[in-house]
Amino acid sequence: MMINTAVLLIFDFNTNVCIVSQKDLDFSSDVVYEYVSKRLNRIIGDAAQKTGVFYATSAFQMKLQALVDGTLTFDDLASQIARELYQLVSHCDEPESTDLLVIDFQDDDDVRNLGILMLDNKTAYTHQILDDEGTVYNKLIKHYAILPGTAQKAEAYALIRLNDFSIHFVDKKRKMDGEDVYLLPDKLLQCTSVISSKEAVKVVSKIAEKVAEEHGASTVEALSKAKTYLVENAETADSFSPQDLGSDVFGDSPVLQREFEEQVKEAKLPEAVAIEKEYAQKAGRSHKIKTDTGIEITFPSEYIENTDFIQFINNPDGTLSIELKNIGKIVNK
């Protein structure tokens, strides 16, 4: 990744003013480079990203085309984005002071991207050192415009590849005239919204658990099989099919499989969901359960079908026993 340029713009709703910077950020400063690069690295490849396609009538896409063609400068585009977003945020029921970071950068494929990051200001306490006629003293003050730390992900952002105008974004729900809105896709970008891989995995997992529970099947087995499917599928594909996942989890029961497929359709999940291999492996690597007796167990998801290591036994009295096998060593943590 290489950052070409970036600019910071301010939405201050304490004084109701949009401050448009007339200079880009100075990347000769290590502090500036560290903050901007870490912010980008936190969101690139984020599994929570939704994807979108510009509507044919999107005015924003035309501005991007002008940027690519060289008829609109980066600074002019950033200023236009800031003024439009400021107006949108100001019309929200509870406008929050925000710093807007607009970045022009090359990704790891050397494709030019535009990044739009909305950084909500935080209130924090800090110290102030004062000098009163030679007497030095410390004072506690409240700061109303603290930027989120580099370890935090931006709650609202958009990344747009300028070679094909593909969009990846995360946004938070806001209230405008009492109605729920997502400012970035609905108002600024004017684009479609496709479920993120993180959300899709969460939805199919809930459906698998619900179907298993309603039909008296093992929810632990269903969820573990779903996770194993994600890991194995990610080895050869960059997307997964919710329907295929259901076939793999409930392959032994046509009734449960049909029920799963019907609920997937009701949830309006796409036929294929893009998913990063790294996220699939992270999400499917292990499964954690907690018993009503307070015992917690975490085990590799693929072990659910291997009784050499763990076995779930249904007792005659309706209780459940869990047997752990072939343990050579126990480590306290």
Features from the language model and the residues they span:
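C-terminal structured domains
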Residues: S247-K333
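Long, hydrophobic alpha/beta structural blocks
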Residues: M2-A283
